[in-house]
Regions:
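Alpha-helical transmembrane segments of multi-pass membrane proteins
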Residues: 6, 10, 14, 48-49, ...
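Short, proline-centered helix/strand-breaking motifs
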Residues: 27, 47, 66, 155-160
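Hydrophobic transmembrane helix module of multi-pass membrane transport proteins
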Residues: 17, 86-170
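Interhelical loop/hinge segments that connect adjacent transmembrane helices in multipass membrane
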Residues: 1-4, 116
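Transmembrane-helix boundary and interhelical linker motifs in polytopic inner-membrane proteins
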Residues: 2, 30, 34-36, 52-86, ...
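Signature of the first transmembrane helix
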Residues: 3-62, 100, 127
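Transmembrane alpha-helix boundary/hinge residues in polytopic small-molecule transporters
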Residues: 24, 63, 133-137
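Alpha-helical transmembrane segments and their helix-entry boundary regions
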Residues: 7, 11, 39, 80, ...
């Protein structure tokens, strides 16, 4: 079996299992253990952080996929990875102090209609930074033709982690 067929099959299995676990999480575990208020809070935190994530990663995950095959020397490929990590890191190093300095103004402006989310602003920022770096490393795994592990981390691991946290939270 070829590498593409094998990885596609394994990715299909992991996505199917992740879908089932996600359905159990959404239909049973969230309402049972968190209630509708906290279920909405978790979904809102993830959605807002997913909106911020592209500004932090600045599209470097797409640049890795686009330009990796253009480089032939190992030093050039390593330089691409270094640059794709440094760009989000520089953005984070600029953005976090500005966010910290204007924290209360940002909270008032962004969360003027719903102040209950404002106390989770740091959580939103942390999730956005984490997902930005995850996307860069996931794209690196894809160009190295190791999509099964990256797909496992992207699809199955978060759902398993949420299920365990919800079960042990109760």
């Amino acid at each position: 079996m070829g590498i593409v067929v094998r990885q596609s099959f394994l990715n299909l299995i992991s996505i199917g299992i992740a879908f089932l676990i996600g359905a159990v999480n959404t239909l049973y575990l969230y309402p049972t253990f968190l209630g509708s208020k906290f279920q909405g809070l978790v979904i809102a935190l993830l959605a807002i952080s997913n909106l911020i994530q592209p500004f932090i990663s600045f599209g470097t995950q797409h640049a890795v996929i686009r330009y990796y095959s253009k480089y032939t020397r190992k030093n050039d490929k390593d330089g691409l990875l270094t640059l794709s990590i440094l760009i989000p890191l520089v953005i984070v190093l600029i953005f976090v102090p500005v966010f910290y300095a204007y924290y209360y103004d940002i909270r008032q402006y962004l969360f003027q209609s719903d102040q209950s989310l404002s106390k989770y602003a740091y959580v939103i920022l942390f999730i956005a930074i984490s997902t930005s770096f995850f996307e860069v490393f996931y794209s690196w795994l894809r160009v190295k033709l190791k999509s099964v592990f990256g797909n496992f981390l992207k699809e199955l691991y978060p759902r398993l982690l949420i299920a365990f946290l919800l079960i042990f939270y109760s």
